[in-house]
Every structure is written in C-alpha cells, then in structure tokens.
Amino acid sequence: MLEDIKENKLKGENNMNVISLINAKGGVGKTTSAISIASLLSQKYKVLLIDLDQQGNATGNSGVDEDNLKFTSKDLFLDESLKMEEIIINTDKGYDLIGSNLEVADTSINLVSKLNREYILRKRLKNINYDYVIIDCSPAVDLLMYNALV
C-alpha cells in the first residue's frame, strides 16, 4: 500500500500531508482507520496522530493511558503558549501522538469566541516536522472538525 501513495498530492505549507478522518456518525471505523494509516505510514515516514475524539480511543489504542495525560488536544487548541514538543507524546507504535480524553469535550465551545478559530490547528502544525499528520475526529460537526478540514 505504501507504494500506492502518490507524491503529487496536495501538501501543506511545510510539505506535510494531513489526512483527516471525518464522519458525523460514530462507529464507522474512523479510529481504527486512523491508527491503521498511522501505523502503516510510520514504517516509512515520520507520522503524528492527533486524537480529537473525547472518547480517547486512538490514544488508548496507541498504548497511552488517556486518564493520565499531562496535555491533550484541548491544550493544542486553547493554550498556544505550550510548545508542540510539550504536547506531543512519543509512542512505541512508531508514530507520535497528541492524545485525547474526556477533557476535550468542551474544547469546541471554548473556541467560539476566538478570532480565526477555524485556523488554530493549521497554525499550530505549521512549524512541526512530520511527513504525515493523521487526525482522528469525533462524530461531531464542530469547530474541531472544521480545524481538521482547514
């Protein structure tokens, strides 16, 4: 499958490829797909998996205890003073992770009053060095999903 990935795809400002798994229905395989894609790509590329789902299944299935996270994807959006290196977790799965848990549930509500709220994730990812960023979204149409699309 790695051979099937074409190099002429759309790339971000820093040549990073972003793949967002989005579906407004739960239980359709977003998390399983996100983890599988991250695992496969990490065999050849530097990969970051971002868990935006408050259930934290991508986090837990990446071997990280979602109940004991120092920082979550909530901090990614709401605390821009934190360096990305502080939020990113190195996993033993071959890819890095920004984890999630129930604390992420109110993140979208807290973004409503922020300027350029749809571009926060794009801005935060701008200066990190990954070949691929895989984003596992929750089954909600909210500002986190919009950030994953932009």
What are these regions (language model features)?
Residues 1-150:
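P-loop NTP-binding core
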